[in-house]
Amino acid sequence: RGVPMIHLSTPGVAGLIGGSREDSPPAPWGAYEESKAEAESILQSVLPPELLTILRPDFVYGPGDRHKLSLFRQVRRGWFPLVGLGGAKLRPTFAGDVSRAVLASLPGGILGPGLWNIGGPEVVSVAELVRAVAAAEGVRLATIPVPRVIFGIALALGPLAPRQLSRSRLQLFGKDHWVDIARASDAGFHPETGLADGLSRTVSWYKSEGLL
Protein backbone atom coordinates (compact mmCIF):
# COMPACT_ATOMS: atom_id res chain seq x y z
CA ARG A 1 0.00 0.00 0.00
CA GLY A 2 1.16 3.50 -0.81
CA VAL A 3 3.27 2.31 -3.77
CA PRO A 4 1.96 2.84 -7.33
CA MET A 5 1.39 -0.37 -9.29
CA ILE A 6 1.31 -1.00 -13.03
CA HIS A 7 -0.53 -4.18 -13.97
CA LEU A 8 -0.26 -5.68 -17.46
CA SER A 9 -3.59 -7.27 -18.33
CA THR A 10 -5.21 -8.27 -21.63
CA PRO A 11 -8.06 -6.99 -23.83
CA GLY A 12 -9.44 -10.52 -23.60
CA VAL A 13 -10.96 -9.46 -20.28
CA ALA A 14 -13.63 -7.75 -22.41
CA GLY A 15 -14.06 -10.78 -24.66
CA LEU A 16 -13.57 -11.27 -28.37
CA ILE A 17 -15.09 -8.09 -29.76
CA GLY A 18 -14.03 -5.43 -32.20
CA GLY A 19 -13.43 -1.94 -30.85
CA SER A 20 -13.50 -2.85 -27.16
CA ARG A 21 -13.19 0.14 -24.86
CA GLU A 22 -11.92 0.48 -21.35
CA ASP A 23 -15.52 0.60 -20.11
CA SER A 24 -16.67 -2.47 -22.08
CA PRO A 25 -18.27 -5.00 -19.71
CA PRO A 26 -16.13 -7.97 -18.66
CA ALA A 27 -16.59 -11.09 -20.78
CA PRO A 28 -13.37 -13.13 -20.52
CA TRP A 29 -13.38 -15.95 -23.05
CA GLY A 30 -10.70 -18.31 -21.70
CA ALA A 31 -8.87 -19.40 -18.57
CA TYR A 32 -6.03 -16.93 -19.13
CA GLU A 33 -8.44 -14.07 -19.68
CA GLU A 34 -10.46 -15.08 -16.61
CA SER A 35 -7.29 -15.00 -14.50
CA LYS A 36 -6.49 -11.51 -15.75
CA ALA A 37 -10.04 -10.33 -15.04
CA GLU A 38 -9.77 -11.70 -11.51
CA ALA A 39 -6.38 -10.01 -11.05
CA GLU A 40 -7.83 -6.68 -12.15
CA SER A 41 -10.72 -7.07 -9.72
CA ILE A 42 -8.46 -7.97 -6.80
CA LEU A 43 -6.11 -5.06 -7.42
CA GLN A 44 -9.00 -2.63 -7.76
CA SER A 45 -10.38 -3.85 -4.44
CA VAL A 46 -7.15 -3.44 -2.45
CA LEU A 47 -5.53 -0.39 -4.03
CA PRO A 48 -6.86 3.16 -4.15
CA PRO A 49 -7.55 4.32 -7.73
CA GLU A 50 -4.73 6.86 -7.66
CA LEU A 51 -2.16 4.09 -7.16
CA LEU A 52 -3.26 1.61 -9.83
CA THR A 53 -2.61 1.66 -13.57
CA ILE A 54 -3.90 -1.22 -15.68
CA LEU A 55 -2.63 -1.63 -19.24
CA ARG A 56 -4.34 -3.91 -21.75
CA PRO A 57 -1.89 -4.32 -24.67
CA ASP A 58 -3.44 -5.91 -27.75
CA PHE A 59 -1.98 -8.85 -29.74
CA VAL A 60 1.64 -8.16 -28.78
CA TYR A 61 4.52 -9.27 -31.01
CA GLY A 62 8.17 -8.31 -31.39
CA PRO A 63 11.77 -9.27 -30.66
CA GLY A 64 11.97 -11.41 -27.54
CA ASP A 65 8.41 -12.71 -27.88
CA ARG A 66 7.96 -16.42 -28.55
CA HIS A 67 4.19 -16.65 -28.15
CA LYS A 68 3.64 -15.65 -31.79
CA LEU A 69 6.54 -17.73 -33.10
CA SER A 70 4.24 -20.52 -34.31
CA LEU A 71 2.43 -17.99 -36.51
CA PHE A 72 5.70 -16.91 -38.12
CA ARG A 73 6.82 -20.52 -38.57
CA GLN A 74 3.55 -21.51 -40.21
CA VAL A 75 3.84 -18.63 -42.68
CA ARG A 76 7.44 -19.69 -43.32
CA ARG A 77 6.14 -23.04 -44.58
CA GLY A 78 4.44 -21.17 -47.43
CA TRP A 79 0.81 -21.85 -46.58
CA PHE A 80 -1.61 -20.70 -43.92
CA PRO A 81 -5.14 -21.91 -43.10
CA LEU A 82 -7.59 -19.05 -42.64
CA VAL A 83 -10.86 -19.21 -40.76
CA GLY A 84 -13.22 -18.51 -43.62
CA LEU A 85 -11.69 -15.80 -45.80
CA GLY A 86 -9.53 -14.44 -42.99
CA GLY A 87 -11.60 -11.31 -42.59
CA ALA A 88 -11.54 -11.16 -38.78
CA LYS A 89 -9.90 -7.95 -37.59
CA LEU A 90 -7.17 -7.51 -34.98
CA ARG A 91 -4.71 -4.83 -33.87
CA PRO A 92 -1.08 -6.05 -33.75
CA THR A 93 0.99 -4.13 -31.20
CA PHE A 94 4.78 -3.97 -31.28
CA ALA A 95 6.43 -4.91 -27.99
CA GLY A 96 8.46 -1.71 -28.02
CA ASP A 97 5.27 0.34 -27.91
CA VAL A 98 4.09 -1.67 -24.92
CA SER A 99 7.37 -0.86 -23.17
CA ARG A 100 6.81 2.80 -23.97
CA ALA A 101 3.33 2.57 -22.45
CA VAL A 102 4.79 1.14 -19.24
CA LEU A 103 7.28 4.01 -19.05
CA ALA A 104 4.46 6.48 -19.74
CA SER A 105 2.58 4.98 -16.78
CA LEU A 106 5.31 5.74 -14.26
CA PRO A 107 4.65 8.62 -11.85
CA GLY A 108 4.64 11.85 -13.84
CA GLY A 109 3.99 10.08 -17.15
CA ILE A 110 1.21 10.95 -19.57
CA LEU A 111 -0.66 7.73 -18.79
CA GLY A 112 -1.74 8.21 -15.22
CA PRO A 113 -3.67 5.87 -12.94
CA GLY A 114 -6.63 4.10 -14.50
CA LEU A 115 -7.34 1.59 -17.24
CA TRP A 116 -5.75 1.99 -20.67
CA ASN A 117 -6.05 0.05 -23.91
CA ILE A 118 -2.71 -0.07 -25.72
CA GLY A 119 -2.62 -0.95 -29.41
CA GLY A 120 -0.67 -0.58 -32.61
CA PRO A 121 -1.47 2.02 -35.28
CA GLU A 122 -3.26 -0.38 -37.64
CA VAL A 123 -6.33 -2.60 -37.47
CA VAL A 124 -5.87 -5.34 -40.07
CA SER A 125 -7.58 -8.54 -41.12
CA VAL A 126 -5.99 -11.89 -40.37
CA ALA A 127 -5.40 -12.34 -44.11
CA GLU A 128 -3.61 -8.99 -44.26
CA LEU A 129 -1.54 -9.89 -41.21
CA VAL A 130 -0.23 -13.22 -42.52
CA ARG A 131 0.56 -11.67 -45.91
CA ALA A 132 2.50 -8.94 -44.15
CA VAL A 133 4.39 -11.61 -42.20
CA ALA A 134 5.16 -13.39 -45.48
CA ALA A 135 6.49 -10.15 -46.96
CA ALA A 136 8.72 -9.64 -43.93
CA GLU A 137 10.03 -13.20 -44.27
CA GLY A 138 10.46 -12.93 -48.03
CA VAL A 139 8.33 -15.98 -48.80
CA ARG A 140 5.45 -16.64 -51.17
CA LEU A 141 2.33 -17.50 -49.21
CA ALA A 142 -0.74 -19.48 -50.16
CA THR A 143 -3.70 -18.73 -47.91
CA ILE A 144 -6.22 -21.55 -47.62
CA PRO A 145 -9.80 -20.63 -46.64
CA VAL A 146 -11.15 -23.21 -44.19
CA PRO A 147 -14.90 -23.13 -43.46
CA ARG A 148 -15.83 -22.90 -39.80
CA VAL A 149 -17.60 -26.24 -40.03
CA ILE A 150 -14.27 -27.89 -40.89
CA PHE A 151 -12.71 -26.33 -37.81
CA GLY A 152 -15.63 -27.74 -35.82
CA ILE A 153 -15.08 -31.24 -37.20
CA ALA A 154 -11.35 -30.99 -36.45
CA LEU A 155 -12.04 -29.91 -32.88
CA ALA A 156 -14.28 -32.95 -32.43
CA LEU A 157 -11.24 -35.13 -33.20
CA GLY A 158 -9.55 -33.90 -30.04
CA PRO A 159 -5.84 -34.77 -29.94
CA LEU A 160 -6.05 -36.22 -33.45
CA ALA A 161 -6.87 -32.82 -34.93
CA PRO A 162 -4.16 -31.01 -36.94
CA ARG A 163 -2.60 -28.33 -34.77
CA GLN A 164 -3.25 -25.80 -37.56
CA LEU A 165 -6.98 -26.28 -36.88
CA SER A 166 -6.92 -25.69 -33.14
CA ARG A 167 -9.56 -24.15 -30.90
CA SER A 168 -7.29 -21.22 -30.05
CA ARG A 169 -6.73 -20.48 -33.74
CA LEU A 170 -10.47 -20.58 -34.37
CA GLN A 171 -11.05 -18.14 -31.51
CA LEU A 172 -8.13 -15.78 -32.12
CA PHE A 173 -8.31 -15.72 -35.91
CA GLY A 174 -12.01 -16.34 -36.41
CA LYS A 175 -13.54 -13.34 -34.64
CA ASP A 176 -12.92 -9.60 -34.54
CA HIS A 177 -10.95 -8.65 -31.45
CA TRP A 178 -9.23 -5.31 -31.36
CA VAL A 179 -9.14 -2.42 -28.93
CA ASP A 180 -10.17 1.20 -29.23
CA ILE A 181 -7.12 3.27 -28.29
CA ALA A 182 -8.84 6.67 -28.31
CA ARG A 183 -8.42 7.21 -24.58
CA ALA A 184 -4.64 6.74 -24.70
CA SER A 185 -4.43 8.85 -27.85
CA ASP A 186 -6.37 11.66 -26.18
CA ALA A 187 -3.84 11.53 -23.33
CA GLY A 188 -1.01 11.97 -25.84
CA PHE A 189 0.22 8.38 -26.14
CA HIS A 190 0.54 7.11 -29.70
CA PRO A 191 2.10 3.91 -31.07
CA GLU A 192 5.31 4.58 -32.99
CA THR A 193 5.96 1.29 -34.80
CA GLY A 194 3.89 0.34 -37.83
CA LEU A 195 3.18 -3.23 -38.81
CA ALA A 196 5.68 -3.59 -41.67
CA ASP A 197 8.56 -2.16 -39.63
CA GLY A 198 7.63 -4.16 -36.53
CA LEU A 199 7.36 -7.43 -38.45
CA SER A 200 10.70 -6.83 -40.17
CA ARG A 201 12.42 -6.29 -36.83
CA THR A 202 10.70 -9.32 -35.35
CA VAL A 203 11.71 -11.61 -38.22
CA SER A 204 15.30 -10.34 -37.96
CA TRP A 205 15.35 -11.23 -34.27
CA TYR A 206 13.87 -14.68 -34.81
CA LYS A 207 16.51 -15.38 -37.45
CA SER A 208 19.34 -14.08 -35.26
CA GLU A 209 18.20 -16.51 -32.56
CA GLY A 210 17.96 -19.42 -34.98
CA LEU A 211 14.21 -19.66 -34.50
CA LEU A 212 13.27 -19.20 -38.16
Give the label of every model feature segment:
Residues 72-83, 139-140, 164:
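A short C-terminal helix-loop "cap" of Rossmann-like NAD(P)-dependent dehydrogenase/epimerase domains
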Residues 4-9, 53-59, 91, 117:
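Structural signature of the Rossmann-like NAD(P)-dependent dehydrogenase/reductase core
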Residues 40-63:
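Conserved beta-loop-beta element that borders a ligand/cofactor-binding pocket
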Residues 95, 115, 131, 154-191:
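Conserved C-terminal active-site "lid" loop/helix of NAD(P)H-dependent oxidoreductases
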Residues 18, 28-40, 61, 65, ...:
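Short-chain dehydrogenase/reductase
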Residues 1-31, 50-53:
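Conserved Rossmann-fold NAD(P)-dependent oxidoreductase catalytic core, especially the SDR/UDP-sugar
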Residues 65-70, 84-107, 113-117:
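Substrate-positioning beta->alpha
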Residues 105-165, 199-212:
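Mid/C-terminal beta-alpha module of Rossmann-like enzyme folds, strongest
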